[in-house]
């Protein structure tokens, strides 16, 4: 058994993202690594729209999805708040208005596994959809 509960944690700061969060969530459920192997951590950063309710609904349906809430402090503050709670071997930061290609988590984690003692950071191409 691995010392990690998940292959990866996707940490998502959320602030007034009701317009985009659904597409973000959809991109995570379609990951080729298997959705059950990914932990999703939403950190609501004081949203005033329905973002928190959307994330809560998603977290109530899946045990690998959690919603944390805090007062607004900005993206970095939300990431720092969520990071200690992450249970994945690898941590991905994803903004609530972004999506991942369906093989991103698998490709990045496979790469990290192959160069585990040599590489500390990987970036990937971002494509705007709006």
PLM regions with names:
Residues 1-130:
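Nucleotide-sugar donor-binding/catalytic module of glycosyltransferases
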């Amino acid at each position: 058994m691995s010392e990690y509960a998940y292959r990866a944690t996707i940490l998502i700061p959320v602030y007034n993202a009701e317009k985009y969060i659904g597409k973000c969530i959809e991109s995570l459920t379609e990951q080729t690594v298997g959705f059950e192997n990914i932990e999703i951590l939403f950190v609501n950063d004081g949203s005033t729209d329905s973002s928190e309710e959307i994330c809560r609904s998603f977290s109530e349906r899946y045990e690998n999805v959690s919603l944390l809430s805090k007062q607004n402090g900005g993206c970095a503050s939300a990431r720092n708040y969520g990071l200690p709670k992450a249970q994945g071997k690898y941590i991905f930061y994803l903004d609530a208005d972004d999506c991942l290609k369906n093989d991103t988590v698998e490709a990045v984690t496979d790469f990290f596994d192959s160069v585990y003692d040599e590489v500390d950071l990987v970036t990937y191409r971002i494509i705007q959809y709006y």
